[in-house]
Regions:
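Structured soluble/peripheral alpha/beta segments that form catalytic or ligand/cofactor-binding pockets
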Residues: 1-288
Length: 288
């Protein structure tokens, strides 16, 4: 029997191991300054290591700050996205930050309005489609908002980020392990203010083999165009070199051509392995 569950909610009840879950908030000011804020939790299946965390990726400098918390300071609903880590609070509509440590001081509040989530239905419960019902998947993915407006401000290591009139994006990952390899890109800062895109391509273990699974969503004028493996989208062309990724997709009579270029300031985001979270994922906030 299929059971519809909100992808945004916490999936790590009963202290299952190995397990990780992280919510990715991208915040961009009206003049293009970007912060990524990722709260989450990790539990090793190899040892007793476990931690809650808040990760901050500074688009101005490429620096990544990773603050650990005791798991007892982590509290999240299993029916909706409402997360507390210490004195910090996270949801789709609101972020409250209050962290002061040796390396990081960040305080403030940002609210989100007019969110555009990937639709969740019984037969297509979010961006993973029917794959979301396969319990043996190593990693699950959810898109909480393709695009939304922001308000508020954050004081971050002596610098002020004013998010009045800014734009945001929220997604998340959870499961036992990250994919072996993947490419991911997202943007909702175009000259056309009603345009947002997210694209991911990964090697997905499947029984005794693997396949290339992908999720591409294009939001435009209140319509979400879905180019995905489970909708039988076809890759017509694909090319990757050290700086540029080109991809052509066909979904029935729709053709989408993507060209993604690396930026110049890479930050190493922390990601799970068998033992711990570590700086393993290069990401750019200044790509094209």
């Amino acid at each position: 029997m299929m059971f519809l569950r909100d992808p945004s909610a916490y999936h790590g009840e009963n202290n299952k191991r190995p397990f990780f879950e992280g919510w990715y908030h991208k915040l961009v000011t009206n003049d293009g300054r970007a912060l990524v804020i990722i709260p989450g939790i990790y539990r090793s299946g190899f040892n007793n290591n476990q931690t809650a965390f808040v990760m901050i990726f500074d688009g101005d400098t490429g620096e990544v700050f990773y603050e650990r918390f005791e798991v007892q300071q982590f509290s999240c609903s299993t029916s909706s996205y409402s997360l507390h880590i210490g004195s910090n609070h996270f949801s789709s509509q609101n972020i409250i930050l209050d962290i002061e440590s040796e390396a990081l001081t960040i305080k403030g509040q940002v609210t989100a309005d007019n969110l555009k989530p990937w639709p969740v239905t019984l037969f297509e419960p979010g961006c993973m489609g029917w794959y979301a019902y396969v319990p043996t998947m190593e990693c699950f993915h959810g898109i909480l908002s393709m695009d939304h407006s922001l308000d508020g401000e954050i004081e971050f290591n002596g610098s002020n980020y004013d998010f009045v009139g800014g734009r945001g994006y929220i997604e998340k990952d959870w499961g036992r392990n990250f994919p072996e390899n993947w490419i991911w890109a997202q943007s909702n800062n175009f000259s056309n203010s009603d345009l947002s895109i997210t694209a991911s391509l990964a090697t997905i273990p499947w029984k005794n083999t693997a396949f290339a699974g992908f999720i591409v969503g294009l939001y435009h004028k209140n319509n979400l165009y879905r180019f995905t493996t489970y909708r039988n989208t076809v890759t017509k062309e694909i090319h990757y070199d050290s700086n540029k990724f080109s991809w052509q997709l066909r979904q029935n009579d729709l053709v989408l051509e993507l060209t993604i270029e690396k930026g110049h300031k890479a930050g190493l985001l922390y990601a799970p392995d068998k033992m711990d979270m570590g700086p393993r994922v290069p990401e750019y906030l200044d790509g094209n």
